[in-house]
């Protein structure tokens, strides 16, 4: 995916 940076 490409949304794992806003879940951090």
Curated annotation (Swiss-Prot):
<keyword id="KW-0929">Antimicrobial</keyword>
<dbReference type="GO" id="GO:0034120">
    <property type="term" value="P:positive regulation of erythrocyte aggregation"/>
</dbReference>
<comment type="subunit">
    <text>Monomer.</text>
</comment>
<keyword id="KW-0325">Glycoprotein</keyword>
<protein>
    <recommendedName>
        <fullName>Lectin</fullName>
    </recommendedName>
</protein>
<keyword id="KW-0430">Lectin</keyword>
<dbReference type="GO" id="GO:0031640">
    <property type="term" value="P:killing of cells of another organism"/>
</dbReference>
<keyword id="KW-0348">Hemagglutinin</keyword>
<dbReference type="GO" id="GO:0030246">
    <property type="term" value="F:carbohydrate binding"/>
</dbReference>
<dbReference type="GO" id="GO:0050832">
    <property type="term" value="P:defense response to fungus"/>
</dbReference>
<comment type="function">
    <text>Has metal-independent hemagglutinating activity against erythrocytes from human, sheep, goat, rat, rabbit and chicken. Hemagglutinating activity is inhibited by glycoproteins fetuin, asialo-fetuin, fibrinogen, asialo-fibrinogen, thyroglobulin, bovine (BSM) as well as porcine submaxillary mucin and asialo-BSM but not by sugars alpha-L-fucose, D-glucose, D-galactose, D-glucosamine, D-galactosamine, lactose, D-melibiose, D/L-mannose, D-mannosamine, D-raffinose, L-rhamnose, xylose, glacaturonic acid or N-acetylglucosamine.</text>
</comment>
<keyword id="KW-0293">Fruiting body</keyword>
<keyword id="KW-0295">Fungicide</keyword>
